[in-house]
């Protein structure tokens, strides 16, 4: 018979097939969504024979120029990337950088999809949430606005002005707490990433952006004559490497030793200098 009908199940055959196809598509979509949560990007500097047998340290990162970004060769670059590579080399570890959805970082850390977070991340306000290395870098937080803006100082940030910050950042916490020399009436807009903050400033959705000075200096250099930093030193923030609070192992101890030595011998300072506005690294411009 040409009738697509199953007398035993009383379900049309085409309906059964459609259900199977729909279910298969649902599985594929679920798999794709899961895959999009994080992406492992191979690192050319960590694929030689000498380190193939080293323990792998899965480092969760997200795009945050100049700390983490993908260069013109498709490899990771940035201040935190270079510091992590050198620290892992000294600690006898093989770094594997995992591009993550930053909002999903805690779940990935707890599930073991990543071992740590190393991406311009501060223990400030989060001391008890993670198991931290000792701070390896102290950064200065500043504020940038368009040159055409009438904002020339923090005193100009009143209730009529809007300031962008990254959601969950120390800058956001301090602004909400009202313990900076900024009017508590200033409007705060929180965004999920540095890139979104940049876009909001470019489109005029906000009047200024508060972030660490390395990021802001890069923005000013990338768009000559468009932006200016008007508050050079709002506060300083320490950066560290965050492991799950229940972590047990030697990695933190070994990384602390490596990072201490890198600070003492000037390696960290040289890496940071490589990424200052206008600087080049390895013959290539440090461009996002």
Language-model features: locations:
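N-terminal hydrophobic or amphipathic helices and topogenic motifs
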Residues: 1-96, 267-288
